[in-house]
């Protein structure tokens, strides 16, 4: 019940001393992981060390990708989705992620994710609405970066990160994410091609 001096319709939980409201606001961060704040630079040295530790604890791809998507989502500011699509039966299938429910299947060669895995290259898209054939799983997404993840010399998955902010991913951030993917590739245990 609201007190007489409190404006009607206001939610006292919204008074978070200048904290940004949005998909990440108010959630607790895992132990040892600082919350990401808009405008803050990501410390990729620390992020890579944290990823290495998670992979040492459990390299099996389902558990590892679940924790890695949570790590990335918590560490990078201004995101609305961070997760993985796995190459399965000739198409990408959604894997572990953080954010709103996502498109389940993406054909190779379609959208940012399908194009990235089809070309086996990182795609850093400053304006997803200008990308031919963009697949909009979340209409709030404005920019996106997709990085292939390899296993046994083949592209086995993509790391997909979306932001509601246009031009979110700088060249410096792209380089940091590529370092993080190399850590993943060294520590992940994927099933053999065609296996589960």
Model-derived segments and spans:
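Regulatory sensory and allosteric helical modules in signal-transduction proteins
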Residues: 79, 87, 91-137
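Short hydrophobic/aromatic beta-strand element in the GNAT-like acyltransferase core
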Residues: 81, 146, 158
């Amino acid at each position: 019940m609201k007190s007489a001096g409190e404006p009607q319709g206001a939610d006292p939980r919204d008074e978070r001393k200048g904290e940004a409201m949005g998909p990440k606001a108010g959630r607790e961060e895992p132990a040892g992981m600082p919350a990401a704040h808009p405008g803050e630079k990501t410390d990729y040295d620390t992020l890579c060390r944290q990823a290495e530790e998670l992979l040492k604890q459990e390299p099996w791809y389902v558990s590892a990708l679940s924790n890695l998507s949570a790590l990335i989502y918590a560490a990078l500011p201004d995101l609305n989705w961070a997760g993985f699509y796995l190459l399965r039966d000739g198409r990408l299938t959604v894997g572990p992620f953080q954010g709103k429910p996502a498109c389940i299947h993406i054909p190779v060669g379609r959208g940012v994710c399908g194009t990235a895995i089809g070309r086996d290259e990182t795609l850093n898209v400053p304006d997803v609405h200008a990308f031919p054939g963009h697949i909009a799983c979340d209409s709030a997404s404005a920019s996106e970066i997709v990085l292939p993840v390899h296993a046994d010399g083949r592209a086995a998955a993509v790391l997909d990160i979306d932001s509601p902010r246009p031009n979110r991913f700088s060249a410096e951030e792209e380089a940091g994410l590529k370092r993080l993917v190399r850590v993943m590739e060294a520590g992940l245990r994927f099933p053999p091609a065609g296996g589960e």
